[in-house]
A protein has these predicted regions:
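ADP-ribose/adenylate-binding Rossmann-like module
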Residues: 75-81, 86-112
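Residue-level detector of alpha-helix initiation sites
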Residues: 21-23, 84, 130
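Hydrophobic beta-strand scaffold residues
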Residues: 38, 60, 97-100
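E1/E1-like adenylate-forming module used to activate ubiquitin-like modifiers
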Residues: 102-152
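Hydrophobic, well-ordered beta-alpha structural blocks that scaffold small-molecule cofactor pockets
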Residues: 1-44, 49-53
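Short loop/edge segments at beta-strand edges and connector loops
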Residues: 42, 60-64, 104
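Glycine-rich, highly charged phosphate/nucleotide-binding loops
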Residues: 53-71
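An accessory alpha-helical subdomain
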Residues: 130-224
Length: 224
């Protein structure tokens, strides 16, 4: 295994993307969703990133990359169709100790971006180490079918239950038993069916009074 998997907290961190095509756009949107401060360097931007740039959510430098553009960056991405530019980005990143993902030549960078399935706080990633993005996409699509939008609500419910249990009864073996039992239940299927009464009954049966969806603060908006 060449790469070590890691989740980075990029909230408020400066990230530079060199390139404005479809690949760069996907990375840009994912980084913005993670709270990064994104600068994109490219003569033009693909949709929908061009609309995002017009709203001032990111910085767009409408030109080609120049040496020194990575100054102050926490991460860098090279996603152009010009290998010379991508290699120049890789060189600048390496000389300045900036982690870089070089899309067309992962061996020049020191990390790669996996295919991602995001269901709220449930994050599933698939990586082939840059060997086969096509296979990573295929596996991602299979996982997307297996883990639908209901899992975003499920993880929220589990988090609320855990928080309430820890607050009321501390981190006891009893709590761990309840949480383990809860994840073995078919809550995801009940969420797909919007079976609120059944979910409430199950939560109260396992966790006791005060653990209905409403009492946990899970409303209709969360279930959309």
């Amino acid at each position: 295994m060449r790469y070590f998997p890691i989740n980075l907290d990029l909230r408020g961190k400066p990230v530079v993307i060199v390139g404005g095509g479809a690949v760069a756009a996907r990375k840009c949107l994912a980084l913005l969703a993670a709270g990064a401060r994104v600068t994109v360097i490219a003569p033009t931007l693909a949709s929908p990133v061009n609309e995002v740039a017009e709203n001032g959510v990111l910085i767009h430098l409408a030109r080609k990359y120049s040496k020194g553009d990575l100054a102050g960056a926490s991460l860098a991405f090279a996603a152009t169709d010009n290998r010379t530019i991508n290699r120049a980005v890789a060189n600048e990143a390496r000389l300045n100790g900036i982690p870089a993902d070089i899309v067309d030549a992962p061996e020049l960078g020191n990390f790669t971006s996996p295919a991602v399935i995001s269901r709220g706080d449930l994050l599933i990633t698939v990586s082939t180490g840059g060997e086969s993005p096509a296979l990573a996409r295929k596996v991602r699509m299979e996982l997307e079918k297996r883990y639908g939008p209901e899992y975003a609500v499920l993880i929220k419910i589990l988090g609320k239950v855990r928080e309430k249990l820890l607050t009321e009864k501390a981190n006891s073996p009893y709590n761990k038993k309840i949480l383990n039992q809860l994840v073995e239940q078919d809550l995801a299927e009940l969420l797909k069916k919007s079976s609120v009464a059944e979910i409430d009954n199950l939560l109260r049966k396992l966790c006791g009074p005060g653990f209905s969806l409403a009492e946990l603060g899970i409303g209709e908006k969360d279930k959309e």
